[in-house]
C-alpha cells in the first residue's frame, strides 16, 4: 500500500477547495483554513476529542461543531467495574460559532450549556482540560480537571480526500501525552485520580467536509512498553486512502509509519450482529502490527433522529502482541490499555 509523506508546509486546500496534497505527515504541515472550504457549509465538521485512560478508568471529552448541530460530550468509564456514563448535549445550527481553532498547536476551546461547561486550555507545552456537569449521573454531578504534559514531538497527521469533489478529512492524533488530575463524581465525591506514571491521553483533532453516509474503524492505545512510552493509531473505512493510511506507531516520542491494518471483529461483515465483547484480532499486510484484543467495556450508543443516525461501539480493553518499528526493532506489547471502535454514521 502506498504511503506518501507530506514533507513541506503548504495550504491544505487549493483554490477549488480540494486537497493540495493527499497523504500523511508527522506534524501539522498542511495549513487548514476554514475560509478556504468551497463546499456546502452545512457539511463542515470540526471537533476536538480527548480520551484519558489508565486501564482502570477513563475520561473522554468532546467539543464538536458539525455546522447543522454542535455536540459536547463527557464520558466517565469505570473499566474495573464495567460501567460508563455518557452525556452528550446538542445545539442546533452552530455553523462555526464554536470557533474551534484552525490548528491544534494554539488556541483554547470552550463550550457551555445548561448546567455544564467544557474547557480545553492550550498552554503550549501543556494542555489543561476542565469539565463540569450538574446531574451527570444517578449519583450527582461531575467535575474534572486534568493536565496533559510531555507532548510528543511527532504525531499522526493525514489528509484524506473523499471521491466526492471538495470533500476531505484532515486529522491529527497525538498519543502518549502524560495525564495528571482528578475526576470527582457523585454526592459522596468519589474521586478518580490520574497519575502521570501510568495515565496517558490521546487527542483526536479533526477538521473536514464529510459525505452523508460513512463507516469508520478506529483504534488507539497509549502506555508503556519496557518502561518507555509507546502507543499507536490504527483505522480505515472512509475516504480515498490510496495516498496513505492513518496507521502509525509511536515510541519514545517518534512516529513509525505502518501500511494497512485490518480489524477482525467477531461477526463483523456478515449478516449477524458483531459480537463486540468477544476477543478481536488485528493483522497487517506488512507483518508489523499483529495484536490480540481483549474487550472490557463496550461504550455503545445509537441515536436516530430523522435523517441523522449514529451507531457507535467504542470498545475499551487491552492489547497483546507485537509491533515492529521502522528500523526492525520488535516490541512485545503486553496488556496495553486502549480502545477500538466501529462507527456507522448518516450525518
Can you say where each PLM-predicted feature lies in the sequence?
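Structured soluble/peripheral alpha/beta segments that form catalytic or ligand/cofactor-binding pockets
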Residues: 1-347
Amino acid at each position: 500500500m502506498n504511503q506518501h509523506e507530506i514533507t513541506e508546509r503548504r495550504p491544505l486546500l487549493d483554490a477549488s477547495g480540494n486537497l493540495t496534497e493527499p497523504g500523511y505527515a508527522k506534524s501539522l504541515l498542511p495549513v487548514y483554513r476554514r475560509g478556504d472550504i468551497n463546499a456546502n457549509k452545512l457539511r463542515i465538521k470540526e471537533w476536538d476529542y480527548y480520551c484519558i485512560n489508565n486501564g482502570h478508568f477513563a475520561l473522554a471529552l468532546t467539543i464538536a461543531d458539525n455546522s447543522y448541530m454542535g455536540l459536547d460530550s463527557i464520558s466517565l468509564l469505570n473499566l474495573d467495574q464495567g460501567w460508563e456514563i455518557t452525556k452528550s448535549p446538542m445545539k442546533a445550527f452552530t455553523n462555526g460559532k464554536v470557533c474551534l481553532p484552525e490548528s491544534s498547536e494554539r488556541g483554547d476551546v470552550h463550550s457551555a450549556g445548561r448546567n455544564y461547561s467544557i474547557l480545553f486550555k492550550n498552554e503550549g507545552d501543556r494542555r489543561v482540560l476542565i469539565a463540569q456537569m450538574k446531574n451527570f449521573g444517578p449519583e450527582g454531578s461531575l467535575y474534572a480537571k486534568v493536565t496533559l504534559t510531555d507532548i510528543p514531538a511527532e504525531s499522526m497527521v493525514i489528509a484524506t480526500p473523499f471521491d466526492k469533489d471538495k470533500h476531505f478529512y484532515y486529522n491529527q492524533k497525538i498519543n502518549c501525552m502524560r495525564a495528571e488530575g482528578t475526576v470527582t463524581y457523585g454526592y459522596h465525591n468519589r474521586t478518580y485520580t490520574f497519575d502521570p506514571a501510568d495515565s496517558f491521553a490521546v487527542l483526536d483533532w479533526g477538521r473536514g467536509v464529510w459525505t452523508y453516509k460513512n463507516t469508520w474503524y478506529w483504534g488507539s492505545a497509549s502506555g508503556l512498553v519496557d518502561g518507555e512510552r509507546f502507543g499507536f493509531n490504527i483505522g480505515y473505512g472512509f475516504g480515498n486512502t490510496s495516498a496513505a493510511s492513518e496507521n502509525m506507531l509511536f515510541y519514545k516520542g517518534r512516529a513509525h509509519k505502518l501500511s494497512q491494518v485490518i480489524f477482525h471483529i467477531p461477526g463483523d461483515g456478515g449478516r449477524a450482529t458483531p459480537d463486540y465483547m468477544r476477543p478481536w484480532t488485528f493483522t497487517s499486510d506488512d507483518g508489523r502490527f499483529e495484536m490480540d484484543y481483549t474487550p472490557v467495556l463496550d461504550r455503545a450508543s445509537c441515536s436516530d433522529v430523522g435523517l441523522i443516525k449514529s451507531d457507535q461501539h467504542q470498545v475499551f480493553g487491552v492489547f497483546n502482541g507485537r509491533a515492529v518499528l521502522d528500523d526492525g526493532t520488535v516490541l512485545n506489547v503486553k496488556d496495553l490499555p486502549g480502545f477500538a471502535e466501529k462507527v456507522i454514521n448518516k450525518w
